A protein has these predicted regions:
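Non-catalytic, conserved peripheral segments adjacent to functional cores
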Residues: 1-105, 126, 133-160
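Conserved metal-binding segment of the jelly-roll/cupin
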Residues: 102-125
């Protein structure tokens, strides 16, 4: 497995390249390996699996300190546009966002550190996204930003 920095601008966000194997039995996708998970996230407290329909936009979600969380995301069915927004006020990239298409046919995963809001739009008829989170859900620290309030091209025709 290889990991690489998403871009020079967002040098804390990483793209992971794992294994995606197809044969007559179906598909095997390994997006990240154990030691790398611990290096990136420190711990894994939650595993989320979310299935959504075409044109759905989920997000932009985050948790404030001291319950901020990092995430590792991959798509196991369909195709999504995954978006991350820097909400760290003292960051050079504060208020800027990046995006990456993730789909079931690739071997990619995306690591998003604490201090970023996260969301995605569904580009295929349906999509299933799986992600690991470094902390537990904390309603008192939970926050969201309306994804349509920002100038982000979600690549969907009729957002749901």
């Amino acid at each position: 497995m290889k990991t690489k920095v998403f871009s020079h601008e967002f040098n804390e966000v990483f793209i992971s390249e794992g294994v995606n194997f197809f044969d007559e039995r179906g598909q095997f996708k390994k997006a990240i390996y154990g030691k790398k998970v611990l290096e990136m996230m420190g711990s894994v407290n939650e595993l989320l699996c979310i299935k959504s329909n075409k044109n759905v936009i989920r997000g932009l979600h985050f948790q404030d300190p001291p319950e901020a969380i990092s995430k590792f995301i991959t798509c196991i069915e369909g195709k999504v546009l995954d978006v991350f927004l820097d909400i760290r006020k003292n960051s050079n990239t504060y208020g800027k966002y990046g995006s990456k298409v993730l789909e079931d046919s690739d071997n990619k995963g995306l690591f998003i550190p604490e201090g970023f809001a996260h969301g995605y739009s569904v580009l295929s008829d349906s999509a299933t996204v799986v992600y690991l989170q470094s902390g537990d859900y904390s309603p008192e620290h939970d926050g969201s930003i309306n994804p349509l309030s920002l100038d982000i091209d979600w690549k969907v025709e009729k957002p749901i």
